[in-house]
Regions:
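Membrane-anchoring alpha-helices and their flanking helix-loop junctions
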Residues: 1-76, 88-148
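Extended, alpha-helix-rich binding/interface surfaces that flank or overlap catalytic cores
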Residues: 84
Length: 148
């Protein structure tokens, strides 16, 4: 796969963009937004942990840079609901930052993150998965959505 930037680094970059661009957008602060942000963060972490456990249970690689080393197609657990729960978890974490620090800018940067990950991570991963798992992956793609 051509992509060499690990998705957690991409998430960190967009998270920093959300935080440091807050002075360019109107400020919306409230206890409700902070609480929703905390809930979003906990959901994101839970999704990530669940996805990693599913990978480990199938004894396959978690490393998105070396997707070619995948030894099995994970379709159980949280992967029944999303083909990309790791990236979905990262979106929830960015939404947490959005709700807590920068509502308008955060929404923009979270959308940009989703576009970036879709084009530069998910699309190349799915090409590799097609080659590795053929019809099994094609069937999985038909039955489970990309994000949620």
């Amino acid at each position: 796969m051509n992509n060499k930037i690990p998705p957690p680094i991409v998430t960190l970059f967009f998270g920093l963009c959300i935080f440091f661009s807050k002075s360019y957008f109107p400020i919306y602060k409230s206890d409700i937004l902070n609480t929703m942000g905390l809930v979003s963060f906990l959901i994101g972490i839970s999704i990530l942990i669940s996805a990693v456990r599913s990978f480990k249970k199938q004894d396959t690689t978690v490393n998105p840079i070396n997707i070619e080393k995948a030894s099995s197609l994970v379709v159980t657990g949280i992967f029944q609901y999303s083909r990309n729960p790791m990236y979905l978890g990262m979106v929830f974490i960015l939404l947490a930052l959005t709700l807590i620090f920068n509502l308008i800018g955060g929404i923009l940067f979270t959308i940009l993150f989703m576009l970036y990950i879709s084009v530069f991570q998910i699309k190349p991963e799915e090409i590799v998965m097609d080659k590795l798992f053929g019809e099994e992956f094609a069937s999985y793609k038909k039955s489970v959505r990309k994000w949620l």
